[in-house]
Amino acid sequence: LSYCTYGGIPRNKITEFYGEPSGGKSTTAIDICKNAIDIFQKEFDAKVEALRKSAASGNKSANAELQDILDCGPKKVLYIDLEHSFDGAWSKTLGIDETRIEIMQPPDVFAEDILQTIQDIIETGEMGLIVLDSIPSLVPKSELEKKLGERTVASLAGLLTIFFRKVVSLLTRYECTLLTINQIRDNMDNPYVIKTPGGQAPKFYASLRIYFRIGHPVDFLGNELPQSAENPAGYIVNARITKQKSAPFDRKNG
């Protein structure tokens, strides 16, 4: 995927992962969190070293800026787990230290409140990466207050349109990247067209979209097994880039 995306997801932009259940979306997102933590720490250390050299040469403004940066620390990573499926043991297996990542698992909270909280967090300037897992788990107030069987029309789509329109410029201003995870739904009108929840806004505002699906099962040596294999060691994940606005769109399959 790093090769297909020309070095990873675009910074200070919106990226969307979508696809089948157990297709590798959340695992890939956690791996990105791990890489982001290391990158932010290296950038912080390099900036501190440069400012210390500048301050040592008598630059008073550099000394003040150095103190501000030391107070804030490196950019942070926030994982918003609306599905309450984040596994600390699994993330540790993937190489991520739980003490270096912020995990938010809100209870039954309105989608309006969660989206506003994300906007407020971006505006603090402290976050370098926010993962929203997942869009279909956002429940608008109008939907949460209705009984089962009562329908609401495009309430989440309307909320997301407003949200993405507001945060797309904030991400650039505060140097924060937003990674959203989405699911797919059966499309009764056209089974050959993939349908995702949340309306058109997640697709429109994303600079990068990647579609994940499960491939062949494999054994512990990485050899492909028949689809009927009962206890495979894992599965090959097929990822296809369906939108790319931050790099050449010539590497679509990973």
What are these regions (language model features)?
Residues L1-R100, I118-Q119, E123:
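The Walker A/P-loop phosphate-binding site
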Residues D38, C72-P74, L94-I101, K146-S155, ...:
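A short alpha->loop->secondary-structure connector
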Residues L66-I69, P106-C176:
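Phosphate-binding/switch loop-helix module in NTP-utilizing enzymes
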Residues K76-Y79, E102-M104, L129, L179, ...:
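Short hydrophobic alpha-helical runs that function as membrane-insertion/retention elements
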Residues D81-E83, S134, N182:
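Glycine-rich, histidine-containing beta strand-loop boundary motifs that form or position
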Residues S85, S137, D186:
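Residues immediately C-terminal
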Residues K92, S142-L144, N190-Y192:
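Short acidic, glycine/serine/threonine-rich loops at helix termini
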Residues I121, V153-G254:
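Phosphate-binding/switch region of NTP-binding enzymes
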